[in-house]
């Protein structure tokens, strides 16, 4: 059973000039680099936070996974990272392979070893990240924060954190306890915002755009 301190992490945004949140990247490394240049992202002063799903389906999952080593990049875990971790732990890889994990089977031995080392970093990714900015508090998770009120280290259903689309489908409303909530997981034609909830997976790997939002 996961301890609350392994599920939640907190970041003080005062340590950076700007903080950006990015939607599901899914291996689209070159697209991400292009968008960062367009946003004038400065890796010396800025922080990029991913809503998860760095890997699978796109052309460079290994390159995107390697971003976890960069000091200017952090992420919450997505359902695709979790599928990869589950596959590596159990040797039951069917679900992962059916959902874009076949890139791993095509790696050279050298690159596979690199990926295995990076999956260790994935094990440390939180499910929920709280970012304390100068004038607001932002909560980032992959698919949902499955409660009507946010509370630091509150017990929540982790499967729903990674997989749920209920709030988005039903437009169930906002969440109290923080100023803004940022999710990905469900590819949309354009960013969707209602109440204080923001969905920013705009289907980059399916021919859409890669959405970045500056929260500080």
UniProtKB/Swiss-Prot annotation:
Its cofactor is Mn(2+). Keywords: Hydrolase, Manganese, Metal-binding, Protein phosphatase. It catalyses: O-phospho-L-seryl-[protein] + H2O = L-seryl-[protein] + phosphate; O-phospho-L-threonyl-[protein] + H2O = L-threonyl-[protein] + phosphate. The keyword rRNA-binding does not apply. The keyword Disulfide bond does not apply. PROSITE patterns: SER_THR_PHOSPHATASE. The active site is at residue 80. GO terms for molecular function: bis(5'-nucleosyl)-tetraphosphatase (symmetrical) activity; metal ion binding; phosphatase activity; protein serine/threonine phosphatase activity. One of its GO terms (cellular component) is cytoplasm. Inhibited by cadmium, copper, zinc when added cobalt when added concomitantly with manganese. Belongs to the PPP phosphatase family. PP-1 subfamily. Neither magnesium nor calcium stimulates activity. This is Serine/threonine-protein phosphatase 1. It comes from Salmonella typhimurium (strain LT2 / SGSC1412 / ATCC 700720). The gene is pphA.
């Amino acid at each position: 059973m996961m301890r609350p301190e392994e599920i939640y992490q907190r970041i003080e945004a005062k340590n950076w000039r700007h903080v950006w949140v990015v939607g599901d990247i899914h291996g689209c490394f070159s697209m991400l680099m292009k968008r960062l240049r367009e946003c004038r992202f400065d890796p010396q002063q800025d922080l990029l936070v991913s809503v998860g799903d760095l890997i699978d389906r796109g052309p460079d999952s290994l390159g995107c996974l390697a971003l976890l080593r960069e000091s200017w990049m952090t992420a919450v875990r997505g359902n695709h990272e979790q599928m990869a971790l589950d596959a590596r732990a159990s040797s039951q890889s069917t679900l992962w392979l059916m959902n874009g994990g076949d890139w791993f089977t095509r790696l050279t031995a050298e690159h596979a070893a690199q990926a295995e080392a990076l999956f260790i970093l994935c094990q440390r990714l939180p499910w929920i990240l709280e970012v304390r900015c100068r004038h607001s508090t932002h909560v980032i998770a992959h698919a949902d924060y499955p409660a009507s009120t946010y509370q630091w280290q509150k017990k929540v259903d982790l499967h729903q954190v990674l997989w749920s689309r209920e709030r988005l489908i039903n437009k169930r409303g906002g969440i109290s306890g923080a100023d803004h909530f940022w999710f990905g997981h469900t590819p949309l034609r354009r960013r969707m915002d209602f109440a204080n909830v923001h969905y920013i997976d705009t289907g980059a790997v399916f021919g859409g755009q890669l959405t970045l939002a500056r929260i500080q």
